[in-house]
Amino acid sequence: MYVISEGMGEKWRPLAVFFCVAGFFVATPIFQANQIIAAANEIVFQPAGTEASLSGDLVMGLVLTLLTSIVIFGGIQRIGLWAARLVPAMVLLYLISVGCILLIHASNIIPSLILIIEDAFAANAVLGGAVGAIILAGARRAAFSNEAGIGTAPMMHGATKTEEPIREGLVAMLGPAIDTILVCTLTGLCILVTGVWESSDSSGIALTVEAFQTSLPFLGSYILAFCVLVFGFTTIVGLSYYGRKCLSFIIGARYGWYFNYWYVGIIIVGLSLIHI
């Protein structure tokens, strides 16, 4: 929004305000909270004989809300401190786990890569226009995953204090590469080489859980649950900063922190809506 209002001039300020209004409503923790709860139910509670329920999800939601409140009410410094400590270690742990799965199914790696290419550019897909739809869906998922081109990441990177802005720019460029090209690609490959995509009706996080359980029976699902918890939680606290900056731009930095109250409340509301 500052690039629009300062770089393009005040006459474009309505566009900057529209961006902030959209960001205010889009920067919500509902998806991440649901994924954390879904992973907990799939990995911990259902194997123990406890089915998912509204009351159980609300209890987990309250715990998540409390942890989120502790972090986001501490400001950008506390958010950055948590993210800097947790994310690199979790990325490394996740990549090591996926690497072990790929080594176990090493003979299926090349056939899986060939399958990806063949299905993407098959004659039937081209004639049916499916390639365009797949590319569009991939672009949407990539933008949701790494925020490339959306305009939100500059809020976080712009808040850093560094003597070398170029280095911060390089860090910003590495984000999409690590997130989408490395983590997401290896996750998809992990699902393919284990074969769970053929034998299971699950999707999303549940399908990834089955891939980990199949190859790493004792630790796989718990490693994945821990990684999902950390990734989801750090994303939740990061999104809160975006929403706060958007509200601050509209009504002033003095009142922007009120966004935090709405943000932590929407976690419980979102978990309640999925049971309606």
Where are these regions (language model features)?
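Transmembrane-helix boundary/entry motifs in multi-pass membrane transporters
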Residues: 1-26, 208-224, 248-255
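Conserved small/polar residues in nucleotide/adenosyl-binding loops
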Residues: 275-276
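Helix-loop-helix module between adjacent transmembrane segments
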Residues: 5-34, 38-71, 226-236, 269
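Membrane-interface alpha-helices at helix entry/exit sites of multi-pass transporters
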Residues: 6, 10-18, 51-52, 162-177, ...
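Extracellular/periplasmic helix-exit of transmembrane alpha-helices
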Residues: 97-115, 158-162, 174, 178-205
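C-terminal membrane-solvent junction of multi-pass transporters and transport-like membrane proteins
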Residues: 8-12, 225-228, 232-270
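Helix-loop-helix hairpins and the membrane-proximal interhelical loops
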Residues: 78-139
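Helix-loop junctions at the membrane interface of multi-pass solute transporters
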Residues: 71, 142-147, 151-165, 172-176
